[in-house]
Curated annotation (Swiss-Prot):
The lineage of its organism: Eukaryota, Viridiplantae, Streptophyta, Embryophyta, Tracheophyta. One of its GO terms (molecular function) is calcium ion binding. This is Probable calcium-binding protein CML13. Ca(2+) 3 binds at residues 110, 112, 114, 116, 121. It comes from Oryza sativa subsp. japonica (Rice). Ca(2+) 2 binds at residues 73, 75, 77, 79, 84. Ca(2+) 1 binds at residues 37, 39, 41, 43, 48. Residues 24-59, 60-95, 97-132, 133-168 form the EF-hand domain. Ca(2+) 4 binds at residues 146, 148, 150, 152, 157. Keywords: Calcium, Metal-binding, Repeat. GO terms for cellular component: centriole; nucleus. Gene3D superfamilies: EF-hand (1.10.238.10). Residues 1-26 are annotated as: Disordered. The gene is CML13. It comes from the Eukaryota.
């Protein structure tokens, strides 16, 4: 942390990426912005944004596109500049990456690949991680996450649980 004019700010570790994006990903975002700013206005409107989002791998409805613009359009112009676009894309990429990570984690824990995490799955992964939970503690974990009462944790229940604990997106 450092202090500038009485304000405290967190220092980014040397070599850390701003916004958590790699230089390559930032370049892709800049290229997408430039490519889809077809009128060279320095801004992207809803139509241009829809094309840019598709190029970056996001399928979105017109309503979602309009909401995205409304969320970041500070001046109410109906379009977004590069800084707003980069900020928005950083958030979208973070959401996608988090979901991908949670999907991988679920797959690792769901050893028998039946689409559900059982008490046996939790016991096995806990043992692999060197955690010693009692059977009762494992049952409580399952019950806490098990919304539909089937005694196991499906993917949606897993996501919900991870969001509540701060590990998810």
């Amino acid at each position: 942390m450092s202090t500038v004019k009485g304000q405290t700010r967190r220092e980014r570790p040397r070599g850390a990426r701003p916004h958590g994006l790699t230089k390559q990903k930032r370049q892709e975002i800049k290229e997408a912005f430039d490519l889809f700013d077809t009128d060279n206005s320095g801004t992207i409107d809803a139509k241009e944004l829809n094309v840019a989002m598709r190029a970056l791998g996001f399928e979105m409805t017109e309503e979602q596109i309009n909401q995205m613009i409304a969320d970041v359009d500070k001046d109410g112009s109906g379009s977004i500049d590069y800084e707003e676009f980069e900020h928005m894309m950083t958030a979208k990429i973070g959401e996608r990456d988090s979901k991908e990570e949670l999907t991988k984690a679920f797959s690792i824990i769901d050893q028998d690949k039946n689409g559900k995490i059982s008490d046996v799955d939790i016991q096995r992964i806990a043992k692999e991680l060197g955690e010693n939970f009692t059977y009762q503690e494992i049952q409580e974990m399952v019950q806490e996450a098990d919304r539909n009462g089937d005694g196991e944790i499906d993917f949606d229940e897993f996501i919900r649980m991870m969001r509540r604990t701060g590990y998810g997106y």
